[in-house]
Amino acid sequence: MNSIQPEHINRHKGSVFTLCTFFCLYIAQAVPSSFLSTALQVLMRENNFSLTTIGLLQLVKLPWIIKFLWAPMIDRRCVTVNDYKRTIIVSELIYAALLLTIGFLQVATDIYFIIFLVVLSLVTSGTQDVATDALAVLTFKKSDKSMVNSMQSMGSFGGALLGGGVLLMALHRYGWQTVLPFLAIFVLIALLPLLFNKHLTINEKPKETKAKKADFIWFFTQKGIWKQIVFLVIYYAGIFGTL
């Protein structure tokens, strides 16, 4: 009995740490993207850009809409926990580097280059999201998936609160060149739990179960799949349309 109890405690601690790991990864995506999509609109308005141009700024979110296009490639390349970790870490390092670069630019004079870099940053964060979601699905049992899903929701909405609210106030006080480097550092710090998490384990996928190019087409030909797709589009459009 005494020998089992410490093992149970260690397993519980590992599960909590793993949940915290995924929360950090999800909030690392949400805070910078929420800040950029909100702050750029404010700064562009202050610099007298037209409302039409500001409205087109929403197109920077396109990478997150079409990230399913490169998701099968990530699934094929990632087999072990280390493969997923490597994909997430590289994506976040590039994400942080792009945020730092954006911080050296001026909205008034470099807006189009800034938008280009923001699009690239959302490509990298979208790639991180694909790998993180896959790792979460493979790490947790069916009965525990609701917990990691709650970490995703907390990270997304908490990130929107911090990025679109708190950091906007910080922007007014400290300026663009201070907040963006802070965001880059924040993204790097959010990687630390993943780096030190030794509890992540998955069953390695046999080669025959890896995603193939034909699976992309097969997915959309499943019976009843379009009803689910339409439901999810309307559901998430309603959620994010209010943010």
Predicted segments, located by residue:
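Juxtamembrane intracellular "pre-TM" segments in multi-pass secondary transporters
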Residues: 2-15, 199-230
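Helix-loop boundary and gating motifs at the non-cytosolic
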Residues: 5-64, 226-227, 231, 236-243
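Glycine-rich segments within core transmembrane alpha-helices of 12-TM secondary carriers
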Residues: 64-67, 146-171
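Transmembrane alpha-helix termini and helix-breaking/packing motifs in multi-pass membrane transporters
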Residues: 72-77, 103, 160-178
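A membrane-interface helix-boundary motif in multi-pass transporters
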Residues: 83-86, 169-186
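C-terminal ends and interior cores of transmembrane alpha-helices
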Residues: 89-108
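Symmetry-related core transmembrane helices of the 12-TM Major Facilitator Superfamily/SLC fold
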Residues: 90-96, 178-196
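Cytoplasmic helix-loop-helix junction between adjacent transmembrane helices
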Residues: 121-155
